[in-house]
Design a protein with these regions (language model features):
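Short secondary-structure boundary/capping segments
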Residues: 28-30, 49-50, 57, 73-74, ...
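Short acidic-glycine-tyrosine-enriched beta hairpin
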Residues: 71-86
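Ligand-binding loop in jelly-roll beta-barrel domains
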Residues: 86-112
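Short, conserved beta-strand element in jelly-roll/cupin
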Residues: 52-67
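A short, N-terminal "cap"/entry segment at the start of jelly-roll beta-barrel domains
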Residues: 1-40, 45-49
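Short strand-coil-strand connectors
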Residues: 32-34, 68-72, 95
Length: 115
């Protein structure tokens, strides 16, 4: 997939064909533009996340799981959107076998300033 276009369609099936990666990766970056980074992720188990420098959005394509963040456990499912601010510890747990999500990092280091 070319990452140089100013507009494009990113197809789930094409992105999914790149997983697992050569070293067994369960995610593939499909688009980069400035501070924007989009990847398809097909994790196979609980993912302990490290806090990220940028704000992060997850678009849940299929499946279900639980987002552990700020001491809370929030269940989610296909069609949901998750937001995690920069620097927040979080973990994706109890994912179903068919789980897939688009992961989007964006904005400046430290995250956007709330309105």
């Amino acid at each position: 997939m070319s990452m140089s276009h100013r507009s494009q369609v990113i197809r789930l099936a094409e992105a999914q064909a790149g997983i697992p990666g050569p070293a067994g990766e369960h995610a593939v970056v499909v688009f980069r533009r400035g501070p924007l980074n989009i990847a398809l992720s097909l994790p196979v188990h609980t993912r302990q996340q490290t806090p990220h420098a940028q704000d992060e959005i997850y678009f849940i394509v299929r499946g279900r799981g639980v987002l552990f963040h700020d001491g809370r456990r929030d269940p989610f499912q296909s069609g949901d959107l998750l937001f995690v601010a920069a620097g927040i510890e979080h973990q994706i747990e109890e994912i179903s076998e068919d789980f897939a999500m688009w992961r989007v990092f964006y904005g400046p280091p430290g995250g956007e300033v709330p309105a």
